[in-house]
Regions:
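Short, cationic low-complexity segments
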Residues: 78
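Acidic, proline-/serine-/threonine-rich low-complexity intrinsically disordered repeat tracts
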Residues: 62-67
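Acidic, low-complexity, intrinsically disordered interaction modules
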Residues: 20-47, 51-61, 81-178
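A residue-level signal for beta-strand positions that form part of recognition/binding surfaces
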Residues: 70, 180
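Short, charge/polar-rich alpha-helical segments
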Residues: 1-13
Length: 186
């Protein structure tokens, strides 16, 4: 994961050192015609360093995350006049709580989007995917792992991924406006 980030960082820096600052996304922050190309490059290099340092710190936290024995997922549904039922997922890992916020719209699986949104906030949980990336890749073709879940694919897909990582998923409660699962190490 770190090597991929470092490689991407080096590619961006190499492109920038050639003097190609006009296609760089940060060029919208440059004052019009008042900065020299050297100053633009220096400014952009600082921004690149800051961005990739944060990416590397996150990757390091994911790689060194402690093992999660159990976590709870709950999804509450709220009615919306425009979008029908909107889910809001909460994942609890020990004393930590991660909340997705309300997911609206139509044409995709909102429940899995809410669960993925809450899951991806935790380095501990993303560490599960990182440490078991070989098992996941063999089963689901997930070779270039960014160690996060994608929403809109159906929550059943997540349960199968967790099971392939050595976890057991139990649906412990459901009702008209809520669902709850416990995911624990086998």
């Amino acid at each position: 994961m770190k090597t991929k980030i470092l490689k991407e960082k080096q590619e961006v820096i190499n492109k920038l050192q050639v003097g190609d600052v006009h296609d760089y996304p940060l060029n919208k922050w440059f004052p019009k015609n008042s900065w020299s190309t050297e100053r633009k490059i220096k400014f952009t290099l600082k921004k690149i360093e800051k961005y990739y340092d944060a990416e590397l710190a996150e990757a390091d936290a994911i790689e060194n995350a402690e093992e999660v024995r159990e976590f709870a997922i709950s999804v509450e549904w709220a009615n919306s006049r425009m979008w029908g039922a909107n889910p809001n997922a909460t994942i609890r890992v020990g004393y930590d709580e991660f909340i997705s916020g309300s997911i609206s719209g139509s044409g995709y699986d909102k429940e899995s989007t809410a669960i993925a949104g809450a899951f991806n906030q935790s380095e501990k949980l993303r560490g599960i995917l990182y440490k078991n990336r070989g098992k996941i890749a063999d089963k689901y073709g997930w070779y270039d792992c960014d160690c996060s879940l994608s929403g809109g694919v159906g929550s059943e897909c997540f349960w199968r991924i967790f099971e392939s990582c050595g976890y057991e998923v139990k649906h412990v409660a459901s009702g008209k406006t809520y669902d709850a699962w416990i995911v624990s190490k086998k």
